[in-house]
């Protein structure tokens, strides 16, 4: 979350960076992974309840009890082969507004999920790497077959860090919605079509329903 909040700041919207959420580079045991996922959910709920960090307008935040998450499921914690792309060309990633962020494909994750082989591009923000606290941050936006029904139609995000070796752990239980889902004042990067997963990812934050 800290990574994408920083991107939102760069897109000239009013938001305040908060604590980061990213997958551990060491695949955890089932019980430890579940505890980690639950801790992530609690911390994300706390962020949304806090008036200084919440993307929710006051009219929604005052009655906010918690986000709607899928139940923690370690099936969606995958250890992917990480293919670095040192020759990738920088590009401008469009957003939900006229603003764009400067990104580069840092690498490609190759993994199996739900019995199918997949790959996702993982990005690094060229606008953030000059800042010490974001030098190791990577951004993974993705689409899947739950979008538009169980989850937000525009896809979700996951924050990662640069791995030391040739594998990277992706915990889809830590997938969260772009902030523009909750408040149109935010400008959010659009998920590239090549990051569409042809499977249902029933993990992470569900679609936001305004009561």
Locations of regions flagged by a protein language model:
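Post-signal-peptide N-terminal segment of Sec-exported extracytoplasmic proteins
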Residues: 32-69
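C-terminal motif of bacterial Sec signal peptides marking the signal peptidase cleavage site
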Residues: 11-14
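Mid-to-C-terminal functional-domain signal that highlights helix-capping/loop sites
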Residues: 158-160, 176
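Positively charged n-region of N-terminal signal peptides that target proteins for export
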Residues: 1-4
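Mid-length scaffold segments of soluble, non-membrane domains
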Residues: 86-153
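Bacterial signal peptide processing site
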Residues: 16-19
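C-terminal partner/receptor-binding element of secreted or periplasmic proteins
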Residues: 186-211
């Amino acid at each position: 979350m800290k990574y994408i909040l920083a991107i939102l700041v760069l897109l000239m919207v009013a938001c305040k960076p908060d604590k980061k959420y990213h997958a551990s580079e060491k695949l955890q045991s089932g019980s430890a992974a579940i505890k980690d996922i639950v801790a992530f959910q609690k911390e994300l709920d706390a962020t949304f309840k806090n008036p200084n960090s919440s993307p929710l307008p006051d009219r929604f935040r005052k009655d906010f009890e918690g986000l709607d998450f899928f139940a923690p499921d370690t099936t969606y914690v995958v250890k992917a082969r990480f293919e670095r792309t040192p020759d990738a060309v920088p590009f401008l990633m469009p957003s939900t507004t006229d603003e764009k962020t400067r990104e580069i494909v840092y690498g490609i994750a190759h993994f199996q999920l739900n019995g199918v082989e997949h790959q996702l591009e993982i990005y690094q923000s060229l606008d953030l790497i000059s800042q010490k606290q974001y030098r190791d941050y990577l951004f993974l936006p993705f689409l899947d077959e739950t979008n538009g029904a169980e989850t937000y139609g525009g896809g979700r995000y996951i924050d990662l860090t640069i791995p030391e070796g040739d594998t990277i752990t992706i915990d889809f239980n830590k997938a969260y919605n772009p902030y523009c889902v909750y408040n149109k004042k935010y400008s959010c990067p659009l998920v590239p079509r090549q990051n569409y997963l042809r499977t249902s990812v029933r993990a992470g934050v569900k679609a936001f329903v305004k009561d």
